[in-house]
Amino acid sequence: IKEYIVSLGSKRLLERKRILTGVDLSINAGECFGIVGRNGSGKSTLLRVLAGIVEPVEGTIITRGTLAPMLGLGVGLEPELTGIENAKLCAALMGCDRSGTQRTTENVRSFSGLSEDDLLMPVKRYSSGMMARLGFSIATANDPDILLVDEVLAVGDAGFQRKCYERIEGMKRRGG
């Protein structure tokens, strides 16, 4: 893909460079992999393309199953809404009915480790660790087939990181 850098004032093209070339990737159910590279090498851009956030200039992306991208702290969360309201909104966007939405919110409550007061507070007041807890809990609440994570779990405490790793291992065992 080509990435465009735009000056905020004039909206004029400052630079154009090719970020990803010759990417050919096939991942099977239950596989887990990491993308390693130097800063600026296109790792995050590749994840945004896989998530459907950025359109490739050429080639195709084929995904089968439900996709849950976690590509930054707070990305996809509405800052004015509470944690629970965000969980309900995400469940609705994923096509959950009323009982599915209730299951999602209960899953978020139990997995995130956030207090009820925290979950009833607007997300804009969350710390980075709280944001990671909420985001990961929402993203994995309905056991997605594909989970894309971009450095989000680098924040927060070691106990929650271990809990996330265990949840990912469980998803892998179930073929997700």
Regions found by a protein language model. Name each.
Residues 29-33, 38-94:
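ABC ATPase nucleotide-binding domain signature region
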Residues 24-27:
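Conserved A-loop
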Residues 5-8, 88-101, 111:
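ABC-type ATPase nucleotide-binding domains, specifically the catalytic core motifs of the NBD
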Residues 98-125:
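Conserved ABC nucleotide-binding domain
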Residues 1-22:
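Pre-NBD coupling/linker segments of ABC/ABC-like ATPases
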Residues 133, 137-149:
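A short, proline-enriched helix->beta-strand linker immediately N-terminal to the Walker B motif
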